[in-house]
Amino acid sequence: RSRGLGDVYKRQVRTMSKIVANAEDGGKVPPLTHVPRTKRGVVSYSARDIAERLNAKAIVAFTTSGDTAKRVARLHSHLPLLAFTPNPAVRSQLALTWGAETFLSPHVKSTDDMMEAIDDALLEMDKYEEGDMIVVIAGTPPGIAGNTNMIQCHLLGETKK
């Protein structure tokens, strides 16, 4: 059976109408409401919980593959999510992640190097100052994708002392 052109246009208008309605509603995806049961999921959930309870200025995800930042993003915290990655392609992907601000970082070999890279980037911004509390979620040792296993409460500027 062939469809007339009118049917195609009606379907296109209905689709555009749904898109507009969703955009006007804020285009919000509901947050993840259940407690995850995987190691990386629980670590991400805990980092968000700790950051909110401590009134941290931000949650920082140091990520190789982007997965850590995406896991935190889907929890929809009211805190800024700052995603650091040494991979330009991952940074481009994360630019499309809900609520994430992305940073290209150097490759780091240790947690101390990671904290120093975070301090250097954030203290250059007007939004953050020395002594601000952030919560960092990452994998240790750094650089291994899928190894999210660390949460650290960090005061900006601590690496300079």
Q: Language-model features: where?
A:
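Nucleotide-binding motor/catalytic cores of P-loop/tubulin-like NTPases across gene-expression machines
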Residues: 68-70, 76-114
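C-terminal accessory/binding modules appended to enzymatic or scaffolding proteins
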Residues: 46-74
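C-terminal binding/interaction regions
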Residues: 129-142, 148-154
